[in-house]
C-alpha cells in the first residue's frame, strides 16, 4: 500500500516539476514574515531556519505532536521529485509554512509545506563545466534566501517572489573552488566556507563574511596558516604555494554570547605526508609539521573575521581523517565546573569537547573500535598515533577506520531533554595503499591513496550504528547496531523520538531514552543520505527527509554488496505526518 501511494505521489510530483512559476493562493506567500536576528536566536517551534535549526548545532526540534506513543502511526503525507542528475544532500528551510529547497541543478523552489504545492521557482544557470551537485544547506534572513552555489557564488533571492536580488562571485570555480554547504547568518553577517582546495591551489581554502544587503565581502580568513608565526611555521618549511587543503566544507555554529563562529577545517592535501612535504620532519626547531589550521576548530569573530582561538585535533593527517564536521554547542558541567563546550566527532569516530571560550581541550570518548589513536593526553588531548597505520608509499596498511570515516558529514543531534547526543557512525576497516607520483608528475589534487574496505576483524556484520552518549558524564546511554550504515543526520525531538535515515532505504524512529526502534518507513526510492527536519504547517507536525545516493558514503557498499541501490534515481523529498 505504501509503495502504491509513493508511486502516485511521485507521478504528481514529476508532473508538477515541469510547471514554471506555479502559484498557490496569493496570501500564502505574502504572509511570510521577515526573518530577524531575534528569530534566528529563538526560532518558532514550527520553523526550521538553518542547517541544524539553531545556532548551537543541536539539530533538535521541540515539537511533540509526533511522540513515542504515536510515531508508529506515521504515514506518507506528500513527496516531491527533485531535478535529475547530481547529488542532493538537501536540508530544506521552512518558515511560516513555506518550504524552500535547492535542487542539484540549482533550481530553487518554494513549496507549500503542508502539501508540496509549488509556489515559485528560480532556476540559477549553473555553468556546464561546474559540478552539478546540490549544496547541503541555505540561509534565510530578512525577506531573502541566501544561497551558495557550486560555482563559488552567493545569491540573494526574495523569499516571497523568487526574484534575484544580487549575485556575488566569491572565488573562481575554474580553479576548483566550490561551495558544498551553505552559509549561516550570524549577527548580521553571512558566513560562508569554501571547498575545492585540494586541486593544487596554492595557500588552501578560506572562510568569508559578507554583507547581506549587497553580498560584499567584509572579511576573509585563510584556513592554512601563513607568515612568520608559530602557526605559519607549522608546515615543515613547505612554501605557501605548495600548501594544499584546509577546506571548510561544513557549515559552522554560532555562539551569540561571545559573538564567535565555531567552524571546522578539513585535512591537508595530498594525504601522503611525504608528498605533502610534511614528512620527514625537518631539523629546524622553529618549525613544526602540524599543518595548521587543518583538522581544527576555528573560533572566529563574526563581525571582524579575527581568529580568537583554535584547537587542532589531528596534526599531520595522512589518512583523510578530517575533523571538519558539525560543532555542537552545549553548556554542561565537566569535572564539577560548568563549561561552555563545543563538541565534534571526527572521522576516527572519537567525540571530543573543547571549551568554546578559550579553546581548552576537555574530554574525548570513542564510539567505534579503531586502531589509529593509541592514547591521548588527558589534559591536552594530544594524541599518540599508531605508527603501524602511517601510510607509506608502495606499502599497504590496515586502518580502522579510513575514508569515508567512522563519522562523516551526517551530524549528530543533541536533545536537551535527555542531555544526550546521538552520533551516527560506521565501524569498518580498510587496506590502504598509497599512490605515488610518476617522475616529473605534478600534484593536481586528490588524496593519492586507494582503499579496500572491509568489516572490522573484531566486529560483526552490523557496521551501522547510533551511539547515544550521556553528555553530563560521557557514559554510553545506548547503542543501536544494524547491517546497513546510518546515512543521515540524527533528528531528536520534543516527543522523545530520534529520527535517522539508512543506506538500505528506510527512515527510522527510535526512543530517545532506550534506543528501542519505534517505527520504520517502507522502502523508499533510494538511500537516505541527507538531513531530516521536522516543522509545522497549518498547526500540523511533519517530518521530512531527502532520498538520494551519491555521497562518499557509497564507498561502503563494497562491504554491503547485498544492499542494492538504483544508481541514477533523481532525489526525492519524502514528508511524513500522523493521519488526520
Regions found by a protein language model. Give the residues of each.
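N-terminal cofactor/phosphate-binding cores enriched in small/glycine residues
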Residues: 57-170, 493
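Beta-propeller blade signature
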Residues: 204-216, 283-286, 290-304, 359, ...
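Loop/turn-rich, solvent-exposed surfaces of beta-rich toroidal or solenoidal domains
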Residues: 458-516
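Conserved blade-register residue in beta-propeller folds
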Residues: 110, 156, 209, 299, ...
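Blade-level signature of beta-propeller repeat domains, shared across WD40, Kelch, NHL, RCC1
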Residues: 533-580
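Repeat-blade elements of multi-bladed beta-propeller folds
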Residues: 48-52, 87-107, 130-154, 178-201, ...
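Blade/loop signatures of beta-propeller domains
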Residues: 27-76, 223-230, 385, 455-456, ...
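Extracytoplasmic beta-rich repeat domains
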Residues: 80-93, 121-142, 167-182, 222-251, ...
Amino acid at each position: 500500500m505504501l509503495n502504491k501511494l509513493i508511486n502516485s505521489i511521485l507521478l504528481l510530483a514529476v508532473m508538477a516539476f515541469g510547471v514554471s512559476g506555479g502559484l498557490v493562493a496569493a496570501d500564502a506567500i505574502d504572509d511570510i514574515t521577515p526573518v530577524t536576528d531575534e528569530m534566528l536566536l529563538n526560532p518558532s517551534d514550527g520553523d526550521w531556519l538553518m542547517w541544524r535549526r539553531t545556532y548551537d548545532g543541536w539539530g533538535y526540534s521541540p515539537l511533540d505532536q509526533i511522540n513515542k506513543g504515536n510515531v508508529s502511526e506515521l504515514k506518507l503525507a506528500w513527496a516531491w521529485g527533485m531535478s535529475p542528475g547530481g547529488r542532493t544532500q538537501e536540508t530544506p528551510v521552512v518558515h511560516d509554512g513555506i518550504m524552500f529547497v535547492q535542487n542539484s541543478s540549482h533550481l530553487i523552489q518554494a513549496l507549500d509545506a503542508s502539501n508540496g504545492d509549488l509556489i515559485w521557482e528560480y532556476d540559477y544557470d549553473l555553468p556546464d563545466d561546474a559540478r552539478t551537485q546540490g549544496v547541503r544547506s541555505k540561509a534565510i534572513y530578512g525577506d531573502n534566501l541566501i544561497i551558495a552555489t557550486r560555482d563559488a557564488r552567493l545569491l540573494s533571492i526574495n523569499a516571497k517572489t523568487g526574484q534575484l536580488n544580487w549575485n556575488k562571485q566569491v572565488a573562481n570555480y575554474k580553479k576548483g573552488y566550490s561551495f558544498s554547504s551553505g552559509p549561516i547568518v550570524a549577527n548580521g553577517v553571512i558566513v560562508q566556507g569554501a571547498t575545492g582546495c585540494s586541486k593544487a591551489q596554492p595557500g588552501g581554502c578560506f572562510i568569508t563574511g559578507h554583507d547581506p544587503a549587497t553580498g560584499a565581502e567584509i572579511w576573509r580568513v585563510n584556513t592554512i596558516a601563513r607568515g612568520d608565526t608559530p602557526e605559519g611555521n607549522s608546515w615543515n618549511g613547505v612554501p605557501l604555494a605548495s600548501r594544499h587543503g584546509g577546506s571548510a566544507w561544513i557549515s559552522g555554529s554560532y555562539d551569540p554570547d561571545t559573538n564567535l563562529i565555531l567552524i571546522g577545517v578539513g585535512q591537508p592535501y595530498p594525504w601522503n605526508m611525504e608528498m605533502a612535504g610534511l614528512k620527514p620532519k625537518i631539523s629546524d626547531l622553529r618549525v613544526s609539521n602540524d599543518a595548521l589550521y587543518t583538522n581544527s576548530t576555528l573560533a572566529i569573530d563574526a563581525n571582524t573575521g579575527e581568529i580568537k582561538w583554535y584547537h587542532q585535533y589531528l596534526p599531520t593527517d595522512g589518512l583523510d581523517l578530517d575533523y571538519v564536521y558539525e560543532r555542537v554547542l552545549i553548556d554542561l558541567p565537566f569535572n564539577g565546573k560548568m563549561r561552555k563546550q563545543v563538541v565534534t566527532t571526527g572521522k576516527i569516530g572519537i567525540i571530543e569537547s573543547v571549551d568554546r571560550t578559550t579553546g581548552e581541550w576537555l574530554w574525548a570518548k570513542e564510539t567505534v573500535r579503531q586502531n589509529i589513536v593509541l592514547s591521548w593526553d588527558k589534559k591536552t588531548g594530544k594524541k599518540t598515533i599508531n605508527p603501524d597505520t602511517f601510510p607509506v608509499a608502495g606499502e599497504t596498511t590496515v586502518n580502522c577506520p579510513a575514508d569515508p570515516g567512522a563519522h562523516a558529514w551526517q551530524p549528530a543531534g543533541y536533545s536537551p531533554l535527555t542531555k544526550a547526543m546521538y552520533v551516527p557512525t560506521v565501524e569498518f576497516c580498510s587496506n590502504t595503499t598509497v599512490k605515488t607520483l610518476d617522475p616529473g608528475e605534478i600534484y593536481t589534487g586528490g588524496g593519492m591513496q586507494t582503499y579496500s574496505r572491509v568489516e572490522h576483524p573484531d566486529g560483526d556484520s552490523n557496521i551501522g550504528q547510533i551511539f547515544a552518549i550521556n553528555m553530563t558524564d560521557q557514559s554510553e546511554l545506548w547503542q543501536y547496531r544494524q547491517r546497513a550504515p546510518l546515512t543521515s543526520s540524527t533528528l531528536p525531538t520534543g516527543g522523545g523520538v530520534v529520527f535517522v535515515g539508512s543506506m538500505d532505504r528506510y527512515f527510522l524512529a527510535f526512543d530517545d531514552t532506550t534506543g528501542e526502534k519505534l517505527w520504520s518507513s517502507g522502502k523508499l526510492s533510494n538511500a537516505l543520505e541527507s538531513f531530516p527536519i521536522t516543522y509545522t504547517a497549518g498547526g500540523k507536525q511533519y517530518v521530512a527527509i531527502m532520498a538520494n545516493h551519491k555521497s562518499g558514503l557509497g564507498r561502503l557498499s563494497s562491504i554491503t554488496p547485498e544492499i542494492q541501490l538504483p544508481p541514477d534515481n533523481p532525489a526525492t523529498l519524502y514528508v511524513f505526518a500522523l493521519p488526520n
